[in-house]
């Protein structure tokens, strides 16, 4: 039934409106504590919820406060045996000589994250649908989860369909489908007389495909910062105003607020668990971790300790502000600080395109920990 529905969506999505451009088309064109979120994630399984602007400290362990420790049992899988990894994330394939970056696990301060079990995941979510919605960091996380599950059931029959904007991977025996919907801004980009317009108040292009999922994981931020040739729009529509540009944090706040209203109005959270993937950091500016003139290139170890020298980015504050205003419970996967500590985990020059990528993450690698935390939130 799920595949028939998605097939129909794929057939009719281009007909909904020729003016709505998928976020991925734009992408390919140039392509601490959780106290103010809709739901805290602690060792009590994230059952402590917040409403409105109330702040309440949950009991138990904060899974996102901790440090990286060497772990010889890692990684979860062999990249050469996973058929779902894009070249841009396959660092070992493109010659990364060191492998120490694969051997770190995240250790919270006062509890233990359950080790990921792909077979248990498939059994628990038999017949269920899990969707990642966002930019290429969502792609990073989607492919990571696919590889983690595949490593547990390497002989399982799968159906893999990769398209723009909607891709699917189904583990047939279990009826579990992982979806990826590529839309870098979440809100719409439309083609108008003046050019490409980023509409901060509209979510129409493809949002119906997000409905009726069992798990939704949203992500957005990186594309809001792009300028020049990599910018995905020509104008911004802010209410009745059409402007060439505006403060990017303000634009992100308004766009994310539109997403929040969409979730509040369209998602039955009694049936669907909703997550927002916290801001994924970049490592182009070494001064952020007290190594001026350095980037992620040549980095071979994570930062020690449990905090990042320059602190969290302002965009994380925007996410917290929006989530705290929502009526429906949304769980923040607060992966920002733990990811900031992993300056060693980017493709750098081993992403296959000849550039230096300090934005995405190698697979195997850091996104496996994001999925381990997602697994913890779903099972603990």
Curated annotation (Swiss-Prot):
Under Gene Ontology molecular function, one entry of this record is: O-acetyltransferase activity
Domain of life, source organism:
Eukaryota
Positions the record marks as coiled coil are none
Q: Which UniProt keywords are present, listed alphabetically?
A: Membrane, Signal-anchor, Transmembrane, Transmembrane helix
Segments carrying motif DCXHWCLPGXXDXWN motif:
357-371
Q: Mind telling me which residue stretches traverse the membrane in this protein?
A: 7-29
- Where in the cell? Membrane
Q: How does it sit in the membrane?
A: Single-pass type II membrane protein
Motif GDS motif, residue range(s) on this chain:
134-136
- Tell me the InterPro entries matching this sequence: TBL, TBL_C, TBL_N
Pfam families tied to this protein: PC-Esterase, PMR5N
Chief localization class? membrane
List, alphabetically, the GO terms of the cellular component aspect.
membrane
Q: What else is known?
A: Contains 2 motifs that are conserved in esterases, but it is unlikely that this protein belongs to the catalytically active pectin esterases.
Q: What does this protein do?
A: May act as a bridging protein that binds pectin and other cell wall polysaccharides. Probably involved in maintaining esterification of pectins. May be involved in the specific O-acetylation of cell wall polymers.
Its family remark reads: Belongs to the PC-esterase family. TBL subfamily.
Name-wise, this protein is Protein trichome birefringence-like 38
Q: Origin organism of this chain?
A: Arabidopsis thaliana (Mouse-ear cress)
């Amino acid at each position: 039934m799920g595949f028939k529905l998605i097939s129909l969506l794929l057939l009719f999505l281009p007909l909904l409106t020729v003016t709505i451009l998928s976020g991925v088309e734009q992408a390919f064109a140039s392509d601490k504590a959780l106290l103010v979120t809709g739901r805290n994630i602690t060792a009590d399984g994230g059952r402590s919820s917040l409403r409105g602007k109330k702040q309440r400290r949950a009991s138990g362990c904060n899974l996102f406060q901790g440090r990286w420790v060497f772990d010889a049992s890692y990684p979860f899988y062999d990249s050469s045996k996973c058929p779902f990894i894009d070249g841009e994330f396959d660092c070992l394939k493109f010659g990364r000589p060191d492998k120490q970056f694969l051997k770190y696990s995240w250790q919270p301060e006062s509890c233990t994250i359950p080790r990921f079990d792909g077979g248990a995941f498939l059994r628990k979510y038999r017949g269920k649908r899990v969707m990642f919605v966002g930019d290429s960091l969502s792609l990073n996380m989607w492919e990571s989860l696919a590889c983690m599950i595949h490593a547990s059931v390497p002989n399982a029959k799968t159906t893999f369909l990769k398209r723009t904007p909607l891709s699917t991977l189904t583990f047939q025996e279990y009826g579990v489908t992982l979806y990826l919907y590529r839309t870098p801004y979440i809100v719409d980009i439309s083609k108008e007389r003046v050019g490409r317009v980023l509409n901060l108040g509209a979510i129409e292009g493809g949002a119906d495909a997000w409905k009726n999922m069992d798990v939704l994981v949203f992500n957005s931020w990186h594309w809001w910062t792009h300028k020049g040739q990599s910018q995905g729009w020509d104008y911004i529509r802010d209410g009745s105003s059409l402007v060439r540009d505006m403060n990017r944090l303000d634009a992100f706040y308004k766009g994310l607020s539109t997403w929040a209203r969409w979730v509040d109005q369209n998602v039955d959270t009694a049936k669907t668990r909703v997550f927002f993937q916290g801001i994924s950091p970049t490592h182009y500016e070494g001064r952020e971790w007290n190594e001026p003139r350095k980037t992620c290139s040549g980095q071979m170890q994570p930062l020690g300790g449990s905090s990042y020298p320059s602190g969290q980015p302002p965009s994380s504050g925007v996410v917290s502000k929006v989530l705290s205003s929502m009526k429906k419970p949304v769980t923040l996967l607060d992966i920002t600080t733990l990811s900031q500590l992993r300056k060693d985990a980017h493709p750098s020059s081993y992403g296959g395109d000849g550039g230096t990528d300090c934005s995405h993450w190698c697979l195997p690698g850091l996104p496996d920990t994001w999925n381990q935390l997602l697994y913890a939130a779903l099972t603990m």
